[in-house]
Amino acid sequence: MSANELVTEFLLAAEQGNINALKACLDKGVDINATNRQKRTAIIIASLNKQYACVEHLIAAGADIDKQDNTCFNPFLISCLTNDLTLLRIVLPAGPDLDRLTRFGGVGITPASEKGHVEIVRELLALTDINVNHTNFVGWTPLLEAIVLNDGGAKQQEIVKLLLDNGANPHMTDKYGKSPLELAREKGFHEIAELLLAAGA
């Protein structure tokens, strides 16, 4: 079998969750961090397909958990983007680089805050020192994303409170100089405005 065929077999095993085939490829000396055309490694593919046993085995075998594909995905960012708490709990103990950026320049907590992934946000704040005031490429913090890019409902209110309780700065503005409080009021998100006021906004 050629090296390319071995890589193809290895990546397919990760996609399908075939742990025995995965181990066999590793035993044959496949490059554990080999990628497909999208620059996806086996651990990225396994993460996207919720093949948790393969993710665990690849971490134990020394896979690079921080390597990112063409769309900036890696296992940690996938867990934050897709609300995959199981994956997050597998990846966090392996010590992922929390400063790796999504394609929009956010850190993991940024899309999780935007999308209303309450449990992911809670876990990140409890277990990591991820930067809650990180500003992405369009000038938004996780707090601003949680307000502007969703519906202001119960999940978003909970995320705003979690962020504020864990050091999010209620005064950091967007690139046009608008504060979280102004933006919440513009959108008619009264409950979020109250949370911001209570935090000193």
What are these regions (language model features)?
Residues 1-9, 148, 165-166, 175-178, ...:
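Ankyrin-repeat-protein effector appendages
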Residues 1-28, 37-40, 198:
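Intrinsically disordered, low-complexity regulatory segments in ankyrin-centric signaling systems
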Residues 12-17, 45-51, 78-84, 111-117, ...:
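Ankyrin repeat A-helix N-terminal signature
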Residues 21, 54, 86-87, 119-120, ...:
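Conserved ankyrin/ankyrin-like repeat signature
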Residues 23-31, 56-64, 89-97, 122-131, ...:
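Ankyrin repeat domain, specifically the short helix-to-loop turn at the C-terminus of the second helix
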Residues 56, 60-114:
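A generic tandem-repeat structural signature
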